[in-house]
Amino acid sequence: MRKASGGGAISRRQMLRSATATGVALPLAQTFPAGHAYAQGQGQLPEINVTLPVFTVAERDRRWAAVRAIMARPQWNLDAIITVGSDRWGNNARYLTQVALVRYAQPGPQVLFPRDPAKTVHVQISATRHVNSWNDRLGPGGWLADGKMALQAETGGEALAKLLAEEGFDRRGTRIGVAKLKGTRFEPEGLVSATLLDTLRSSLPGVAFVPIEQWGPDAGPIDEVALAKSPEEQEVIRRSVAINEQGLAAAIAAARNGATRQADLWWAAFTTMFADAGEDFIRLSIGLDEGGNSNIGEPVGDAVRRGQICTQEISAAFQGYGCQINHSFFIGSPSTPGYDYYRAAIDVLLKVHEKAMAFIEPGKTTYGEFEENTRQSFADLNEQGGGLGVHSGGIGQCRVRSRPGEDQKIVMQPGHSFDFKPSVSLRRAGMAGAGKRVQLGESILVTEEGAVRYGSRSMGPIATHT
C-alpha cells in the first residue's frame, strides 16, 4: 500500500473508524485532522438507505426454470447443483435464492438446488439468527412463502453431505454440479475447499461431483442464464449505475471543494454510494494521472493537484448487482494547462463509443467481433487505444468478460449487460499533458433493436472548475 503524504498508509478501516465509533451521522469533517483543507465546511453524512430483497416470485420461477432446463441438457445431465460455504462471495447462492451473508464474517450460503421442481431448494446458513433474519426478509409474499425453498441453520461439508443423502442424492451415478469448483472468472482454480470436497466424496461414494462453469457459449447452467438480464434485473442494474454516477459526482464535488488527497475523493464517493445502496460496493478505485485500477480499490494519500486527470473504476452494488462506469475528469478549469489534451482525448473516446453502440446487432454480433471493431475504430482515428472492451455486469463478479478464446464466440443477446470501458493515450507532441491515459466507460444493455446506455449522465468532458 502506498504511503500517505504524512508518512502513514491510509486503510479503508482507518477511514471508517471514526464513523463506526460515533455513528452514521458523524460529520464528514471529523474524519480528517483538524485544519485539513477538505474538513472545512462539510455537512452531515447522507442518511443511509435500508434495502430489502426486491425480486418477485415470478422472477424466481423464471430463473429456476431456465437453470433446470440447462441442467437437463445431455452435456450437463445434472441431478442437482450445490454451492459451498468456502465460496464466501456467494454470488451463485444469491442468484438462486437471494440469500447473502456479510462477506468474511462467516461461510457463504450452502444451497442444494435440485433439477426436479417438485423437490425443495434448501439453503444452509450458519446460525439461527441468519435463518430468522432471512425468514423475515423472504417470508410473507416472498421466495419462501410457498414452501419451495427452506432455510437451515447448518453449514460445512458434513451438514451438506447429510442433506444430500436425506434428499435422495446419495445413489450411485448421481451427478452433482458444484458451483465455483473450477473455471471461474477470477479464480481459475475454484473456490471449493478441498477438505469439504473430500468430505462429500467420502460420505457419498459413487456420486459424481462435477464443475458447472466453463468458457465459451455453453457457459453452464447458472452462468448462461445469468448473462441475459430480465426486466427486473435490468431495473436493479439501472439503479446501481445511477448510484455509480452519484459517487462520481461526489468525487468531482470533493475535488472542486478543496480535497487535497486521493483519499478525500474516495471517501466522498464511498459515503454517497454506500448510503444510497445500503450495501457494500463491488469496486471503487481512483487514480490520479494513472489508471483507475492503480490503487486496488483503497484510499491513499496521493496529492490532488490542478492539471491532473482523475480516472476511476466505480461499481456500486444494489441487491448484489453492479455494472461499472469510468469517466476521467480534469482537475482544474478549461484554462489550466493540460485541459486541451484531456478534452481532445474525451472527444476521441466519444467517437469510439458511438461506433461501438452502432455496431451491435443482437443475435448476430459476437463479443470477439465487438472488440475487433473497437480496435479498428482506434486505428481509423490513428490513435493508441486500450482498456477492456467488455467487462462483466450483473450479480457480483459474474460474466461476461471477454478473454482470448472461447468467450469471444458468445453472441450478444437481448438482456446482456456489460461495461464498455475504452481508454486512449493521444499522440500529441508538445501539448501539455500529452501521453496521459484517459478513460470513458459506460454500462451497456443489449436490447431487441441494438444497445442502450444504463447511465444518464452527460458523457462529455468534465472540468472541476470553471
What are these model-derived regions, one by one?
Residues 2-466:
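Active-site neighborhoods and metal-handling regions in enzymes and metal-associated proteins
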